[in-house]
Amino acid sequence: MKPVDCFLHCPKCGQPAAQPGNAPFHCAACGFLLYFNPAIAAGAVLLAPDDTVLLIRRAKDPHRGKLSVPGGFVDAGEVAEDALRREIREEVGLSLERLDYFCSLPNSYHYRGVTYQVLDFFFLGRVTAKAVQTDPAEVSEVCWIRREEIALEEIAFDSVREMLRRFLSQSSS
């Protein structure tokens, strides 16, 4: 189910939707128009001094038990870099000053029966040490992995898998 599928009636005037499931939602009775833009998320490839990559094992759904990069959703009023720094602090207890933009990719986030469209912004960062402090509600395991040992089939999201594919091909050239 997509978010637009939840609107069977106009949220402004209460009239039944003339064409439920169409995006944007448009009410024929009062003219109300509601867009369903993607949510924004940010993630980072974090490199240690020995050039290993930090991957986390997700502790919750979607994709519990799969690997991903640290990151999460951008809150209203936040810029992607600040949201990413916050998420990295919350998930693995690391503070980063410098983040370099790498790429952006669309993603679908399936959660509790609803599929959200997301635009993921990815960054590259370096850490000075591998000591982390995880939030067990978010992260079940931290893995420092050599680039050539990253198993893309173990990665949680299509966008993260594609970003890592690009990162790995760029690093090997």
What are these regions (language model features)?
Residues 5-9, 24:
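Residues immediately within or flanking Cys/His clusters that coordinate Zn2+
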Residues 10-13, 27-30:
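Short cysteine-rich clusters marking metal-coordination/redox-active sites
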Residues 18-24, 36-40:
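Short Cys/His-rich "knuckle" micro-motifs
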Residues 20, 95-104:
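A short coil-to-beta-strand element that immediately follows conserved catalytic motifs
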Residues 29-53, 73:
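Conserved N-terminal beta-strand and adjoining loop/helix that marks the start
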Residues 48-90:
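Conserved Nudix-box catalytic region and its N-terminal flanking loop in Nudix hydrolases
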Residues 103-131:
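Active-site-adjacent beta-strand/loop module that shapes the phosphate/pyrophosphate-binding cleft
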Residues 133-164:
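NUDIX/MutT-family hydrolases
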